[in-house]
Amino acid sequence: MKYWNQITPENEGKWGVVEATRGQYNWAALDKIYDFARKNNIPVKAHNFVWGQQAPSWISGLSAADQRTAIENWIKAYCTRYPDTVMIDVVNEAVEGHAPAAYAKNAFAGKDWITEVFKLARKHCPNSELIYNDYNFLTWDTDKILALIKPAVDAGVVDGLGMQSHSLYSPKVWSAQEIKDKLDKIGALGTDLYISEYDIEATNDQTQLDYMKMHFPVFWNHPKVKGITLWGYVVGKTWRTGTGLIQENGTERPAMTWLMNYLKEERAK
């Protein structure tokens, strides 16, 4: 593969997509992704198991006991079908004000629900790296997220922390030093770190290039960062305007050309 050595399905692996009707699983889109990955020897990261958005509509109407069963059945079904999944975003955006899964909080009332969900993932996905994923992790909400996830980390069920990196430039441009300091602080918790959803929302080529050159080397060279995922790459096909790095005809934007040259030079060291 010219550009990538890891795949993260953006929507195809979310619970509400796969199990829109309880007990009926639609694996068609995911099967294609895993087949492609296996043929090309590319690891897959699952995204995501438990989130307050894009969950099946039927889950909120169940009793707590049935919600617990449904969550476990979903996790078990996924990892039974795709046991070679290398990494999993187990819980996504659980900080209050983000998108915490109310159904999971209800299912495990009286306990730390994040820890309980990770325990289920550990039980059924023993060979996968289990990750907590959230936005504003490197910026405004670092302390809140660390406080939220610490019990699960202390319980030994979290392997990595995923830092969505969509908004490093608006409404404030975070300097390279500020991002390094944040990585140091988060890394002190002891888990692996992942830049999980990196994009640069800039239609101006020079602006996108400048931001890429500012932050990517900080990610790449930090000892705790084990991987970087770009959140979409084809212009006009990404979730936010201006984040694409390659035109549909294959022409690279300057930020992509710089990135490829940077990685080539780094690997030659």
Question: Where on the chain are the PLM-derived regions?
Answer:
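Structural recognition of alpha->loop->beta junctions
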Residues: 1-6, 67, 73-87, 149-162, ...
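Substrate-binding cleft and catalytic face of glycoside hydrolase catalytic domains
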Residues: 2-20, 28-139, 189-191, 202-204
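Short glycine-rich, flexible loops that bind phosphorylated cofactors or substrates
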Residues: 15-16, 170, 237
